[in-house]
Amino acid sequence: MVQAGGNCGMHVHKFVEHFDTIYTFEPDPLNFFCLVNNLPYSNVIKIQGCLSDENKLVEIEKPYGDIGSIRINKNVKQGKIPCFTIDELKLDHCDLIQLDIEGYEMFALRGAKETIKKFHPLICIEYVHFQHYGTDNKEVDNFLFSNGYELVAKYVTDRIYKYVPFNLRIS
């Protein structure tokens, strides 16, 4: 499993018993400190950084002043926080990608193209704030639909997509 927007570990804590290995990403130093202390599990690999479609260094900001709304500052060209791609993890398997990264989900999905094609994981994303980075919900949907995914559930601001082979699609 790959999870981004780890915050203080609340989401990951719920997944620990269900996945052999969980990679969780959190860029904010204070949140990451809490995450490390809240998740002492050996199957959780904690990475202080962001997910993107390329390796780079970024700055983060808290536009609303709270620890749950951290996002990449698009006005700063180079920062101190590393970005990684999911594909570079070279996973042996991946059953779930869960992204809550304040509108940067499309970039993380682009950086997971090979992982998505190889493993067809369930994908759960927060479905808001895309416009901050020049993307939108249509771009996210088109990317997932073109890779064989269908929307299977909505919960508040989250969307869950499941891979369905083209030959098994009804529509």
Where on the chain are the PLM-derived regions?
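Phosphate/nucleotide-binding beta-alpha loop and adjacent structural elements of enzyme active sites
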Residues: 1-171
